[in-house]
Swiss-Prot record:
Signal peptide boundaries: none
Chain's gene name: lpxD
GO CC annotation terms, alphabetical: membrane
Active site annotation, chain numbering: 251
UniProt xrefs under Gene3D superfamilies: Hexapeptide repeat proteins, MurE/MurF, N-terminal domain
Protein name: UDP-3-O-acylglucosamine N-acyltransferase
Transmembrane parts of this sequence: none
Length: 338
């Protein structure tokens, strides 16, 4: 159970609770055991109003407490504790961590294979059938769940969570407070090949990938995402970067601090992406280009050259009836001949 007092403390790591001085001792001691939407929440749950579209549900909510802006706080029921904040959605994000289920397993599982030269910090959890290579360093309070592989000479920071089936290649550096979800591949071989005179006969000459992957602090990487090691220089993921599931980051890519990347995006080699960029789902970005800070790319955008001015960019056409699309496609081909 989480008290209102604990919620306030958590919220105020990001923003103030504007009416906390008005809450009495009984309200501050109120205990909650979960989070629900305005319509379904019960007296032991917290809810929030982040979108005015749901304002009609506020007056009838049975939530024990609600996160709300000053503009709407008078519309909450009298028996519901209103916590007034500038951003209810951010407050919800902050307190959600208090209600998350914590893993019950700790310590090192007897089936884990750990090299004698590995340096394991304090309060580290290593799950079943993990393999930890030579000269690996794992920071305090980090948790590796089952079947994680960490190759030689890799360093993992403090307070990291690494989910099952993650593979981290040799010589990589993972920062502090990093979350790698199931099936992530860090530091696999980049897609580097030189063509021979006739690849159909003599094939392609493999280029050894000699760089590393460097991941900053407070990074989250979703399931089945692949981040390849650099060919010569390193592949670099900055601080506070969040990457969704099924994203491909090729060798020598650099991603700036605070950038968010949605699922199915592919970033080709040696491209540099700035800080605070927002990249929608299924975006394709060609190699050897630069994207400046504060760029937003809407879903399925295809980027073929550098972007030097901050702003929002899109490409492609939205869904329409097939007959209309065929007419539009004809006109598009005609424009190309003009």
């Amino acid at each position: 159970m989480i008290t209102i007092e604990q919620l306030i403390s958590q919220i105020e790591q990001r923003q103030p609770v504007l009416n906390k001085a008005e809450l009495n001792a009984e309200q501050r001691r109120l205990s909650l055991k979960g989070i629900g939407n305005l319509m379904m929440a019960n007296r032991q749950q917290l809810s929030f109003l982040a979108n005015p579209h749901y304002l009609s549900s506020l007056a009838n909510t049975h939530a024990g407490a609600v996160l709300i802006t000053a503009e709407h706080h008078n519309e909450a029921p009298n028996d519901t504790v209103a916590l007034i904040v500038a951003s209810p959605y951010l407050a919800y994000a902050s307190v959600s961590q208090l209600f998350a289920r914590q893993p019950s397993v700790s310590g090192i599982h007897p089936t884990a294979v750990i090299a004698d030269s590995a340096v394991i910090g304090n309060q580290v959890t290593i799950g079943a059938f993990c393999v930890i290579g030579e000269q690996v360093q794992i920071g305090d309070r980090s948790a590796l769940q089952a079947h994680v592989v960490v190759e030689d000479n890799t360093a993992i920071g403090t307070d990291c969570v690494i989910k099952p089936q993650v593979v981290i290649g040799h010589d990589c550096i993972i920062g502090n407070h990093v979350r790698l979800h199931a099936g992530v591949s860090i530091g696999s071989e980049g897609f580097g090949f030189a063509p021979t005179r006739n690849p159909s006969v003599t094939g392609w000459e493999r280029i050894a990938q000699l760089g590393r992957v460097l991941i900053g602090n407070h990074v989250r990487i979703g399931s089945q995402t692949c981040i390849d090691r650099g060919a010569i220089d390193d592949t670099v993921i900055g601080n506070h970067v969040i990457i969704d599931n099924l994203v491909q980051v090729a060798h020598n890519v650099r991603i700036g601090d605070g950038t968010a990347i949605a699922a199915h995006t592919g970033i080709a080699g040696s491209t540099s992406i700035g800080k605070r960029c927002i990249i929608g789902g299924a975006v394709g970005i060609t190699g050897h280009i630069d994207i400046t800070d504060d760029v937003t790319l809407s879903g399925m955008t295809m980027v073929t050259k550098s972007i030097t001015t901050a702003g929002s960019y899109s490409s492609g056409t939205a869904a329409m009836p097939t007959t209309n699309w065929r007419r539009a496609a004809v006109r598009f081909r005609q424009l190309g001949r003009d």
